[in-house]
Amino acid sequence: MRSCLGFLVLMVVAGSAVAQSENPGDIPPGHEVDVQLSNDTLQLKYLSSGKKVGVENSRFSGAFFLSEDRDIVLSAGLVFPVDFDFGRLSVLIGPQVYAALLNEENNDVMAMSLGAELRFVLDKDLDLAVAGYAYYAPDVLTFGSADNLTDLSAQVEIPLSKQMKGFAGMRWFEFDLTEGGGTKKLQDEIFVGLGYRF
């Protein structure tokens, strides 16, 4: 019950903190497709303005994740810019939903998380930046064969051309399984990737 109330409070705070400007920071005007690779994982991610799903002043994302063990995770999120001036730092918060088909039979998971995404521009001329996110789904909002979900990532980004960027970083992505099943680590390693804006 406490977890549920805490999550609802966070959602209210998130809703009251979003920016009201017409052109908030870090909301892409067009579309972006990212391809992320590590030794054991592949992820394809699509980013666009939330207008595509009928929500103004937001950013929508959808992703397909595949591990070497043939774990498949689909996710979708909607984040909103925080209404504070942090200079070179942009902060977005919002929910993200995960649907996982794990390689073990009958080990499927659905989770509704809340998190934050940050991006800090190190060099404005080069648009060199560090970025990261943190999402957590508590037991009360995690269904199926897991009790909770944790998804953390940090990366360095650098533009390669007007429409393309390169990035590299580290991701920690795991479920705590039910009935003493331990921890299911989907990713715990370095990755590299490319992003294309159009």
What are these regions (language model features)?
Residues H31, D40-L44, S58-F60, I72-L78, ...:
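Hydrophobic, lipid-facing positions within transmembrane beta-strands of outer-membrane proteins
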Residues R70-A76, F80-D83, V91:
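Intrinsically disordered, glycine/charged-rich N-terminal periplasmic/extracytoplasmic linker segments
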Residues S61-A63, L92-V97:
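Extended hydrophobic secondary-structure segments that form protein cores and membrane-embedded regions
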Residues A14-S16:
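N-terminal signal peptide c-region/cleavage motif recognized by signal peptidases
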Residues G50, V82-V91, Y98-F198:
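Outer-membrane beta-barrel transmembrane domain signature
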Residues Q20-P28, P81-F86, S90:
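Short, surface-exposed loop and linker segments with low hydrophobicity and enrichment for Pro/Ser/Thr
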